[in-house]
């Protein structure tokens, strides 16, 4: 028998160790080791025992055998990486700039091996004649426990484990001896926890209407042809979920499996229940509220083929299905699909890659697709399908834009405009419900004038300046600074500063204005406990409250038929976030918020309160006109050179010593200027991050902008080598983050 060797990646995150090391596979472990297996290996000069993951197995040694170490053992309690996911991890490592072990741990959704709940049965093997001989022998030697068990098995040849251990008082040692003698066998089976109950029964979602069927047929035709990723752009309430389910039925009928990605914030009972009602216990769910062992159980059920549909947030993308057929990405525009830890992968890009590796399909849906996804449709990389009418031809809500500058001029300094207050009173009289949405997304201390709406912005980057405690206004892209202002430079008004109102303050004001109204608040403070999120939504859905106040979590895919009014408070907060995507985020949030109104039989209305009523993000959200928004946003991106009009690489640095970090990031800037070559490559920064310190680590960034991704990839590789040989970076933690075209 020829020798077997394994290429192993060590479980140490270090650029210098980011390669495979070859080990001998001992003969006794040959049958247990395959690509993806976690193993114990001796490593380094001291041969300390560490964990590694096998990437490949072969019969060709790369080094002399007398120099090669051997694998010590298979790590029994560790999860195994599926072979298909190893290839995906290799792509992520190259694409997003990480070590292979970081990429492997990302595609390994759970770090521990699933154990399940083991059930045991004791079955009799010996025939009656031999049993008589054994009983006679046991009596002579006074083996009371064996006599008791054998008599019980003669009466009932298969006994449940608990009966044997608890009722008959039989020890594990006795069972082991009798099993060794061939008298009986211990049958062990594992069952896995199932978070989805079939007790409520199955229902069908109904037949697609003409608009939905046209999209289903169009996507099926695309699958038969180019099989490009498909994007469904459907207005809020158009019935995209039913389209997903029709396509899922086809894939399941072919014996394949489906992954459905839903943002964590929208992963509610109401959303998941529709899939469970249609597909029953073929569905399983994972989410962050589960324990690691609960998530491990669901991944094991997927690997064994016990379930066919995995629903979950970003991490569900790595479900180890044996024959994946379809990946659905609901609310494709959601920012939570982008990882904030290395590797900083995007679920959309990674889903497209996984589908390509496994010959599966990708279908995405959103009322407000990301600009990146729409650009991919424009270039022909994705196929676009539109759903412009609500299901059942329900009318879109009417929208009123309240100019808060005019409210101030009329003496109204309340958080609620006169129009919104008037409409709330009408809804309360008619026993209808109201949602008040505080748009705090991306708020990081921007400064604006309440009289004219002027916002202090960077003259170089067109992003909002951030107020700091040292009296400075700072740009977190390029580092530009200017002194804090006490009067508006545009109109001279003293009413200039940051926006301080939070959901708690709004709740207090609303209760004062409407003392008889039943008010619920939903934010980070009220949803800390495990089930509080569902309890608040269920209470509101049941009509136990008249007004629901909250942040972005209340506008994510919830369906409340009795909600006829939505108030979007302070729409400008996300518009002035320190991010070139601020306009896109604002349009998406406002469109989603407006879409919560009038989803039942009663007509809906939305009031958008803003200091910038003329901004295209506000105007197009009010008109629910995605096409107009996309055109104007792309004009802005092209003018400023932001993705998807260009490629952007962010180099994030963190360190305990602020001066040392600043020096290191300046070294990076100078080195990039020296090697960039192409004049079209722009180096921006270094500058402090929007949140400049977290957990005692100072944070800074340098940005590199270029027309092609290949240019940035080449610069990153050179920079990585420069950092590796330069001792000045040893106390600085660096991350690379690409913002691609699609």
Positions of PLM-derived features:
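Accessory, non-ATPase domains that flank or precede helicase/AAA+ motor cores in DNA-metabolism machines
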Residues: 1-366, 378-394, 675-678, 703, ...
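A short, contiguous, amphipathic alpha-helix enriched in charged residues
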Residues: 5, 34-35, 660-673
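Short, intrinsically disordered low-complexity segments
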Residues: 38, 59, 682-710
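A carboxyl-terminal module marker
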Residues: 670, 674-676, 680-698, 719, ...
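A general secondary-structure junction signal
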Residues: 56-58, 108, 188-190, 438-440, ...
């Amino acid at each position: 028998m020829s020798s077997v060797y394994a290429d192993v990646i060590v479980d140490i995150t270090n650029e210098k160790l980011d390669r495979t090391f070859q080990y001998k596979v001992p003969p006794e472990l040959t049958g247990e080791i395959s690509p993806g297996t976690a193993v114990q290996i001796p490593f380094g000069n001291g041969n300390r025992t560490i964990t590694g993951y096998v990437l490949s197995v072969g019969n060709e040694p790369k080094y002399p055998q007398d120099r090669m170490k051997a694998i010590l053992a298979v790590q029994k309690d560790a999860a195994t990486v599926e072979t298909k996911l190893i290839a995906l991890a290799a792509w992520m490592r190259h694409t997003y700039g990480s070590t292979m072990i970081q990429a492997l741990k990302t595609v390994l959704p759970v770090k521990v091996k699933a154990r399940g709940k083991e059930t045991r049965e004791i079955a009799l093997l010996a025939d009656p004649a031999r049993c008589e001989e054994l009983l006679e022998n046991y009596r002579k030697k006074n083996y009371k426990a064996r006599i008791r068990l054998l008599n019980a098995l003669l009466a009932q040849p298969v006994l449940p484990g608990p009966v044997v251990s608890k009722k008959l008082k039989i020890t594990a040692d006795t069972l082991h001896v009798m099993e060794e003698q061939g008298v009986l066998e211990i049958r062990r089976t594992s069952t896995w926890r199932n978070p989805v109950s079939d007790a409520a029964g199955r229902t069908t979602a109904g037949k697609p209407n003409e608009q939905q069927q046209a999209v289903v047929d169009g996507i099926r035709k695309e699958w038969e042809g180019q099989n490009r990723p498909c994007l469904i752009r459907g207005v809020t309430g158009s019935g995209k979920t039913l389209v997903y389910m029709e396509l899922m039925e086809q894939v399941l009928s072919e014996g394949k499996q489906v992954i459905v990605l839903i943002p964590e914030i929208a992963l509610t009972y109401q959303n998941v229940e529709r899939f469970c009602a249609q597909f029953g216990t073929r569905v399983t769910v994972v989410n962050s509220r589960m324990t690691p062992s609960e998530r491990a159980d669901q991944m094991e059920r997927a690997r064994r083929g016990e379930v066919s549909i995995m629903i979950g947030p970003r991490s569900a993308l790595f479900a180890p299905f044996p024959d994946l057929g379809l990946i659905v990405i609901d609310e494709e525009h959601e920012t939570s699909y982008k990882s904030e830890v290395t590797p900083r992968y995007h679920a959309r890009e990674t889903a497209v890659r996984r589908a390509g590796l496994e010959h599966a399909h990708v279908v995405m849906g959103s009322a407000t697709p990301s600009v990146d996804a729409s650009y991919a449709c424009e270039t022909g990389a994705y196929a676009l399908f539109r759903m412009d009418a609500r299901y059942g031809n329900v009318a879109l809500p009417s929208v009123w834009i309240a100019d808060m500058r005019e409210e101030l001029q009329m003496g109204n300094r309340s958080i609620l405009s006169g129009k919104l207050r008037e409409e709330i009173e009408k809804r309360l009289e008619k026993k209808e419900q109201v949602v008040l949405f505080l748009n705090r997304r991306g708020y990081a201390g921007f400064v604006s004038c309440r009289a004219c709406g002027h916002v202090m912005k960077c003259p170089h980057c067109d992003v909002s300046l951030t107020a700091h405690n040292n009296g400075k206004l700072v740009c977190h892209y390029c580092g530009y600074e200017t002194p804090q202002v006490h009067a508006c430079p545009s109109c001279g008004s003293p009413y200039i500063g940051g926006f301080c109102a939070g959901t708690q303050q709004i709740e207090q004001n609303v209760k004062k204005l409407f003392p008889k109204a039943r008010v619920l608040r939903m934010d980070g403070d009220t949803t800390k406990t495990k089930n509080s999120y569902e309890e608040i939504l269920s209470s509101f859905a049941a009509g136990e409250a008249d007004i629901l106040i909250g942040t972005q979590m209340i506008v994510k895919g919830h369906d409340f038929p009795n909600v006829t009014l939505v108030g979007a408070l302070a729409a400008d907060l996300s518009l002035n976030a320190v991010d070139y995507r601020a306009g896109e985020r604002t349009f998406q949030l406002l469109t989603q918020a407006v879409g919560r109104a009038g989803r039942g039989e009663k007509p809906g209305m939305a009031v958008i309160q803003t200091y910038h009523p003329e901004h295209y993000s506000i105007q197009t959200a009010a008109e629910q006109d995605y096409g107009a928004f996309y055109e104007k946003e792309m004009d802005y991106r092209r003018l400023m050179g932001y993705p998807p009009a260009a490629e952007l690489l962010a180099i994030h640095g963190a360190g305990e010593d602020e001066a040392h970090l600043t020096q290191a990031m300046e070294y990076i800037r100078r080195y990039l200027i020296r090697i960039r070559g192409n004049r079209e490559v722009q180096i921006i920064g270094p500058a402090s991050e929007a949140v400049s310190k977290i957990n005692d680590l100072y944070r800074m960034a340098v940005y590199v902008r270029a027309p092609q991704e290949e240019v940035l990839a080449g610069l990153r590789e050179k920079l990585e080598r420069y950092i590796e040989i330069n001792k000045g970076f040893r106390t600085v933690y660096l991350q690379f983050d690409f913002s691609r075209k699609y």
